[in-house]
C-alpha cells in the first residue's frame, strides 16, 4: 500500500517545522535508510545514506531559521514544494532564500530522494 497524498503532503510542513525548531531528529525521521539529498542540485555533491544526510543537516539546524511553505503539489509519490527560509546569522545579518524541493517517497511515506532547486540568485 502506498503512502497517502495527505501523508506525502504533510512532509513539507514537517520538514519546515523541523528546520525552524532546529530539530535534527525530526528531520532525520522523514528520511528512509538509503535516501539521497542533493542540495542544491548541480553542486556536484549528493549525500547518500542517513549518516551523510545527518552530517549535512547538522550544520543546517544549528542556524536560527524561520521558514514557510508557500505551495505544495503531490503527484504519485513525489512532493514538489516551494518555500522560503530566512537564516539569522546574528542580530544584524540575515538572508532569505526561495527554494523548490522535490522529494520522492517510499510506500511508508519516508523520503528516498530530496533535490533542492536554488541558486544564489534566489537569495536576498
Regions found by a protein language model. Give the residues of each.
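A beta-strand edge to alpha-helix "cap/lid" segment located at domain peripheries
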Residues: 2, 23, 38, 44, ...
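General structural signal for alpha-helix termini and helix-helix connectors
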Residues: 14, 37-40
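Short N-terminal micro-motifs specific to bacterial/archaeal maturation
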Residues: 18, 43-44
